[in-house]
Amino acid sequence: MKILAPCNHPNEVDLLLEAGADELYCGVLSQAWRSRFTNLASCNRREWRAANLDDVEQLGRVVARTHAHGAVIHLALNAFYTEEQYPLVLEQVEQALALEVDALIVADPGLIRTLHERYPAVRLHISTGGTTFNRATVAFYRSFGAARIVLPRQLRIEEMTAIIAAHPDLEFEAFVLNSGCKNIDGFCTFQHGVSELRHGPLWKVPKRLGLDGLLLDGLRYVPKSLARKVRAGRLPMDSACHLSYQVTDLTQPSTKQSRCLAKNVKDSFSLLAAVDPCAACRLPELLAGGLHGVKIVGRNHPTAKKHRDVVFLRGLLDALSTDMVTDFRAMARQEFRRLYGYACAELCYYSDEAK
């Protein structure tokens, strides 16, 4: 099972691949795009410059370094586009193909069809924004040349396994670290960049300096009174992803599994849900289910955080391959504490069982 790591600068490539990543993915937010459509209408669903390569020159360096390691690199073009945006999107596609990017991560049905018709040999990976919740949707994307599907966060592992079994000749990915939002990517219209617009320096400066991840880490150690203010929305955060939602279990009768799912959804709407969610404990099930790769979220995260994430997963997968681990969950939690310096917060991906 492969490890897919995010990359936002050529200098990260060697470090991440040597740490154990098998594949990288990235996005480009060029000056031409920002000038015409602004950051908020990002071509790859990441509005922050800190999450992106600046231009095609940087992309070329990332591709060259990745290929020098014998690894592969995927370019994200996974937003939904207006007609006037298509020329710049297709220009970036042509530039990426000229640089020999290995695959394009896409979600827009119009773009998927266009790429399949114009570039039938190009590997298309359907983003989680493509909302692939069942085997029929997989068959639909297969008809347009999809080679890989990124499965939504909202699926249970048993559902993933059934979908994979129905299409054994396709590759599938699932998220395992960071950004465990329970909103459905392809349907959600929340704007992640609102706080940056309303409270510019407070949010832009840390991102530009690569310190935003460190600030989020600090939330674990703030007094409970301040943490309550964060949850209540009384600090300058305007992202709808971080409001304090009421989540109700409507299952009748309520079950342990449904209560666990409801709690997991509620816990996911917080600032810490941007950095802490994890599925390390479920790696054995994901591996047994036939998953091609596990994906680390966080193109905007500091390089040190990305590196630590790769080291964490590589160590667990290597241990899993030895068949000598008697209590994998306990080992995963022990490694989490050792590498990250704090205990597992139990913000779990695919938390359909009581812990």
List the predicted regions and their residue ranges:
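Active-site pocket-lining/capping segments in soluble small-molecule metabolic enzymes
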Residues: 1-130, 150, 157-295, 299-355
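As written
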Residues: 145-146
